[in-house]
Amino acid sequence: MCIRDSPDTQFTIIDGVVDAPNVQNVIFKEHEGSFLVGIMAAMASNSGTVGFVGGMDIPLISRFECGYKQGVAHADSSMSVLAQMTGSTPAAWGNPTKGGEITRSQVENGADVVYAAAGGTGMGVYQTAADMGVLAIGVDSNQNYIQPGTMLTSMYKKVGLAAYESFAAAVDGSWSGGFKVNGVAEDGVGAAMDEYNADLVSADMLAAVNTARAAIIAGDIVVHDYMSDNSCPL
């Protein structure tokens, strides 16, 4: 079904954009969620160096990277961040071997926490981190269960909630086209806490995340969005 051929049908696109009046585009402030897990990475690190493994080298993934770097610096401005994208083609999303190789290199260069925003490539990041005795951070959904005990947290996006809210709005008549942006203030992104990472998250770490979350909501912390100007302040 073509969206433009069905003007009386309401469509919701999650994590994508279609410019049409009968489409609601739901997108997320990944930079804000990445800021929160960056704080956790900095606080969990003993080496003073953390890592980031991106998937395809596109502005969206640079948004994750930039938010993460800002969170790390917010917690400890002396920290170093090693960052590398997996590739420049869609194959970068499904190369766990390459993800593992990048992770190994970062760990050998001092990183003891590695955040992956790389799709299926992240599975290689998580496995290598576990094998080398360092921590990893998952992405998009709660992936803490994948390597229990070595997954510090995951930067989740509440896609299910976004879908529910869109359907509920359609039912009650409040649905509208355009953009719906879910960030920290909308409880659309955050850092996952559960039984799988409970032993890794200190009270101080949790307090720091909650304080930063409140500051973002209040507007006291503004996390720069790489996609707003294709630049990162760090």
Where would I find each of the regions flagged by the language model?
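A residue-level marker of the well-folded mature domains of exported/periplasmic proteins
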Residues: 4-234
